[in-house]
């Protein structure tokens, strides 16, 4: 298997893997229910104006007291860190604290990009403390934070392992040299299904296309991610749209996909829009199939004790993105955060983390370490995808500030059934 970190670089993997063909319990808990959708609509209504240029110089970084305070507050997505077998410790994080002398308060309160931004918007705009020195937003939100000058520039001199960022993750339009953001894990969006229930209901072994989700036998048993870029992206790809291109995936094209999804929801083809709480729905057989994140499916099978669920990228393609490390402007322990980022860019630590979280590792050398750790793991294309696999993935194009607002509003209304 070819090491995925040797992939050629392509200018639109702004958000993860630009080579991916220019047609181009777990991590998340996204917007759930009317309250969450309301938060998204509220966020859209107050989305900041701006452009895709360089960060604003208006805000001044908080004074870094890392040399005198060996502490760090890291707010991450739920279930996005390795655990011991008894789930009482976090081996890689514990080792970092022992080796560095930095005490880490690890929070799992980053439940959704829109929700987190909405709650912390005023502090971000003012450059004040958001309750964490280090956060891991998804690329699209990170691009906004960089654009609006709300995160600090990192000191690469403090991160010797910065050189281990896989080439495919460099060149993002909003942060070409990864001076403000450093990839944490890559994310795939595709289709999952309960193998036994799907066959029992449809007579087929597995779905093959996005359209198979709308079979009448599955009415009321299909879930979509509440993360717009994944659900809309996968469905748009099935319609032959190039979600990486603003000339193909125009606002009119987006609205056409939104209308399709609204119709499917009204006809009960879609049961719900959810974040990773959909795992509970699959576990209790409420959901039979849906558009989900790949790493969650690996975790679901682990919890089930056998390969209960299948996951695939349809021939029309799946979505790809990344969550990134970044330091908010009001954080006071940037140097400590840089030490932690550097630690997780050691290939040994990256491989150990990947073995548990089951998302794509962006670290050069992690594949070779994974072979030593677990050869079977190293051959898992959902964690170490090869070039052929990535050719069927597509990065959702960057949106202007105006598009962010209109797209989020439309998506929120769909989830409300409006």
Show the residue positions of the predicted features.
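Extracytoplasmic/periplasmic substrate-recognition and gating elements
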Residues: 292, 296, 302-356, 416-418
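Bacterial lipoprotein signal-peptidase II cleavage site
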Residues: 47-55
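Ligand-binding pocket segment of bilobal, Venus flytrap-like solute-binding proteins
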Residues: 221-227, 231, 235-239, 244-312
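N-terminal secretory signal peptides
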Residues: 1-25, 36-41
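A structural signal for short loop-to-beta-strand junctions that line the ligand-binding cleft
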Residues: 63, 128-137, 152-193, 221
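Conserved C-terminal helix/tail region of periplasmic/extracytoplasmic solute-binding proteins
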Residues: 280, 386-418
